[in-house]
């Protein structure tokens, strides 16, 4: 069976934290959740997989592709990540987020996005900083 994610010996060091020699595989068709204490490295691992930060060592393949390869940016269009909270600048609102996502994802569908905004009862013009934690998770 092929793996959707292969992480081999990945390390990342910050001033006060080290993710050391992480190795894991996720078979295709599987769903994975990362659970752990605050500061355990869950968000760092996701950022490494999505190539939002670079590892100090090791390798990461996603869908059979090195996540640092030029084609990975296009492959990210088909990858879903759900974080515990959205990390948008505090002054943005739902309409601003739509514009950013439209520029980020080729397949972005504003009608579907605003359908979910309505379904989840999120105010389109309210600043992100004024959202509750639950509202941020929905966004």
Residue ranges and their predicted role:
Residues 11-14, 62, 69, 105:
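Conserved A-loop
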């Amino acid at each position: 069976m092929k793996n959707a994610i292969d992480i081999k010996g990945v390390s990342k060091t910050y001033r006060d934290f080290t993710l050391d020699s992480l190795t894991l595989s996720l078979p295709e068709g599987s769903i994975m959740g990362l659970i752990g204490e605050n500061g355990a490295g869950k968000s760092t691992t996701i950022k490494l997989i999505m190539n939002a930060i670079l590892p100090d060592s090791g390798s990461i393949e996603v869908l059979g592709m090195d996540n640092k390869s030029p084609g990975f940016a296009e492959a990210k269009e088909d990858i879903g990540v759900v974080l515990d909270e959205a990390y948008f600048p505090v002054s943005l609102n739902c309409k601003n987020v739509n514009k950013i996502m439209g520029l980020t994802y080729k397949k972005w569908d504003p009608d579907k996005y605003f359908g979910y905004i309505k379904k989840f009862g999120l105010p389109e013009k309210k600043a992100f900083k004024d959202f509750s934690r639950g509202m941020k998770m929905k966004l």
